[in-house]
């Protein structure tokens, strides 16, 4: 797994999405997380108990910026609070 920091996450998500991700993490909504190569698969419960599946892959650009390819089964689909919670859980 490519190492990343809170600053990296701040470059990927809006402050609101990161805040909602922190709330999900604090509430124990990250149900599973598995590192697979340079990415993760996981499951995060939504605000109302729904269960959403996430897959993501991280890499660094030539200038060192963190890049993400992600997918979530929620209606947002990517760069959502569920993906943020999964990444925050890894820090």
List where the protein language model places each region.
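Long, low-complexity, compositionally biased intrinsically disordered regions
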Residues: 1-91
């Amino acid at each position: 797994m490519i190492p990343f920091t809170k600053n990296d996450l701040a470059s990927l998500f809006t402050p609101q999405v990161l805040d909602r991700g922190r709330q999900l993490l604090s509430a124990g909504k990250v149900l599973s997380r598995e590192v697979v190569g340079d990415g993760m698969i996981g499951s995060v419960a939504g605000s109302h108990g729904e269960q959403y599946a996430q897959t993501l892959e991280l890499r660094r650009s030539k200038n060192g910026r963190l890049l993400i390819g992600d997918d979530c089964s929620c209606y947002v689909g990517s760069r959502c609070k569920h993906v943020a919670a999964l990444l925050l859980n890894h820090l």
